């Protein structure tokens, strides 16, 4: 380890011990050196003894800084790996940090765009509008038309910090599987997933492309508005987009004061999510309250505004079908169907015992129906199914983990806005309509429509392809006949050689008998003839 890594590691150890997180170390023989090593830091005391473990962990990550805050936020979505009390505390982590110098931000943007800001923008505000761990946002106006925009710029010092901390995380992850039940936590997978998320968020060209696609998907929609991206000014570390004005969706008091129809707003959140997943196969996977606003206009017919498209997810057609049918089967309590769908989709191994799997699902999920249907959480249904399936060697599906995380956000948000929200009643017609649209005449017609351009392009080639196939067939047929004849001749040769070998063996045996009976002349004759037959047979066998 480098001196810098050692210094950083000491800081992490000091923070963790000052929050009493050494109690997370399992009391097993393997961790004895660690527990003894704890006494080597005897001067660092637990300064937060009155707080619960989950809260102490959250506060420690908050103190360690932005990289660890985002790591904690990601861990809060992995409720299949951690106790709910800890996951709930981690979900409270706020990705808010002090902004860096606006003059530095200006210089950094100018370097990326290749000229002074005044060439493209007026009224650039060096005071950040908002600041987070990865980037911060400044306001300005486009010089060409006076439109208000925001400029998002990556922190210039963030990459070395990310690399150093992720490297330390990997070192820790290499050690965790040695602990009892450590493999179940899949530490390397968790760190790898986090690293990928960070790398994606560091590339604002990726976020720009995501925002452009999401805006196109909801163009002229009455449910969701996505601000316009000005792609000409976007670079890997700078993004320029339309400035929006709205009420943060978490500000319930302001929404009610505005006269917002909370029931419609909550239901639209669910519809927006399922539209993204099942219609578009492209969903915003970071829909926490900080990224969602509500337009000031038409509060009786509320419109969501979505920002920050750095993390998105997608499902292929098969995943969508299995997911929709899983939900429908679950709410119909058809656990056999749920088990079969998991096997058919390849989410669990093909040799899984369906009866055992069905029983395990029933045992875990049946108690859920003790609640009224309106109170059942889709996200926790998925979580229970994934946890059960993992016992049957279900491979982690990253796209489903993202989906489950987003679904939990949407559910929590919907019930915060309108506690009486019946998620199943809102989603069921959507799911059933989508499943029905995938079968029957409409589905066939749609498939033909989608393939029409392909077949129109290939149609002129069909006569040549048929002619080539017929010629190839004739050539293959001729070769097959020749091979068949050669095999026949070879089999005949083999039969002859085997016949001669048999005669040779018989003659040698007879010669041996004559030799025993003292008839030397007959013995020599028979044995010579037998040897000759054997040699000829062996020779022919070798040639064939």
UniProtKB/Swiss-Prot annotation:
Involved pathway(s): Cofactor biosynthesis; ubiquinone biosynthesis [regulation]
Location, primary (coarse class): membrane
EC number: 2.7.-.-
Subcellular location: Cell inner membrane
Active-site feature positions: 286
Keywords: ATP-binding, Cell inner membrane, Cell membrane, Kinase, Membrane, Nucleotide-binding, Transferase, Transmembrane, Transmembrane helix, Ubiquinone biosynthesis
Disulfide-bond pairs as recorded: none
Residues annotated as domain Protein kinase: 123-500
Topology of the protein relative to the lipid bilayer: Multi-pass membrane protein
TM ranges: 499-519, 522-542
InterPro entries associated with the record: ABC1_dom, Kinase-like_dom_sf, UbiB, UbiB_bact, UbiB_kinase
Gene Ontology molecular functions: ATP binding; protein kinase activity
GO cellular component, one term: plasma membrane
Phenotype upon loss of function: Cells lacking this gene fail to produce coenzyme Q8, and accumulate octaprenylphenol (OPP).
Pfam family, one: ABC1
Signal peptide: none
CDD domains: UbiB
A GO BP entry: regulation of ubiquinone biosynthetic process
SUPFAM superfamilies with a match to the protein in the record: Protein kinase-like (PK-like)
Family of this protein: Belongs to the ABC1 family. UbiB subfamily.
Function (record text): Is probably a protein kinase regulator of UbiI activity which is involved in aerobic coenzyme Q (ubiquinone) biosynthesis. Required for the expression of 2'-N-acetyltransferase.
HAMAP family noted in UniProt: UbiB (MF_00414)
Record's protein name: Probable protein kinase UbiB
Organism field: Providencia stuartii
Lineage of producing organism: Bacteria, Pseudomonadati, Pseudomonadota, Gammaproteobacteria, Enterobacterales
């Amino acid at each position: 380890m480098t001196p810098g890594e050692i210094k950083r590691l000491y800081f992490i150890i000091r923070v963790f011990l000052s929050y009493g997180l050494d109690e997370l170390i399992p009391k097993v023989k393997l961790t004895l050196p660690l527990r003894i090593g704890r006494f080597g830091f005897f001067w660092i005391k637990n300064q937060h003894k009155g707080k619960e473990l989950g809260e102490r962990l959250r506060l420690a990550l908050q103190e360690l800084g932005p990289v660890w805050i985002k790591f904690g936020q990601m861990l809060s979505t992995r409720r299949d790996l951690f106790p709910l009390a800890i996951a709930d505390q981690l979900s409270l982590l706020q990705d808010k940090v002090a902004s860096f110098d606006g003059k530095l931000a200006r210089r950094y943007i100018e370097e990326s765009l290749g000229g002074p800001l005044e060439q493209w923008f007026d009224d650039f505000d060096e005071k950040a509008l908002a600041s987070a761990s990865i980037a911060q946002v400044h306001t300005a106006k486009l010089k060409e038309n006076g439109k208000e925009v925001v400029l998002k710029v990556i922190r210039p010092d963030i990459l070395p910090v990310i690399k150093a901390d992720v490297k330390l995380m990997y070192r820790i992850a290499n050690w965790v599987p040695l602990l009892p039940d450590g493999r179940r936590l899949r530490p390397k997978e968790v760190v790898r997933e986090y690293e990928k998320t960070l790398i994606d968020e560091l590339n604002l060209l990726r976020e720009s492309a995501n925002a452009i696609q999401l805006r196109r998907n909801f163009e002229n929609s009455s449910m969701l508005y996505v601000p316009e991206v000005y792609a000409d000014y976007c670079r890997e570390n700078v993004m320029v987009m339309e400035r929006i004005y709205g009420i943060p969706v978490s500000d319930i008091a302001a929404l009610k004061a505005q006269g917002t129809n909370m029931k419609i707003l909550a239901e639209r959140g669910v519809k927006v999510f399922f539209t993204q997943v099942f219609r578009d196969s492209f969903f915003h996977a970071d829909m926490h309250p900080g990224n969602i606003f509500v337009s000031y206009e038409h509060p009786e017919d509320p419109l969501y505004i979505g920002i920050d498209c750095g993390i998105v997810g997608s499902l292929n057609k098969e995943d969508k079908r299995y997911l929709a049918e899983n939900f429908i089967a679950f709410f119909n309590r058809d656990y056999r169907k749920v088990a079969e769908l998991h096997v058919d989709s390849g989410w669990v191994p093909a040799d899984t015992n369906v009866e055992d799997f069905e029983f395990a699902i029933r045992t875990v999920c049946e108690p859920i129906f003790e609640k009224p249907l309106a109170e059942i959480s889709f996200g926790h249904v998925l979580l229970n199914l994934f946890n059960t399936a993992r016992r049957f060697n279900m491979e982690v599906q990253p796209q489903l983990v993202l989906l489950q995380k987003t679904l939990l956000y949407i559910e929590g948000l919907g019930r915060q806005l309108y506690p009486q929200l019946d998620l199943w009643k809102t989603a069921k017609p959507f799911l059933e309509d989508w499943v029905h649209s995938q079968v029957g005449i409409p589905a066939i017609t749609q498939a033909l429509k989608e393939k029409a351009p392909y077949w129109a392009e290939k149609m002129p080639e069909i006569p040549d392809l048929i002619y080539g196939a017929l010629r190839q067939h004739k050539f293959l047929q001729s070769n097959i006949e020749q091979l068949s004849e050669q095999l026949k001749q070879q089999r005949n040769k083999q039969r002859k050689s085997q016949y001669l070998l048999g005669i040779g063996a018989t003659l040698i045996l007879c010669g041996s008998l004559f030799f025993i009976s003292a008839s030397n002349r007959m013995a020599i004759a028979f044995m010579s003839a037998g040897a000759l037959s054997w040699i000829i047979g062996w020779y022919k066998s070798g040639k064939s």
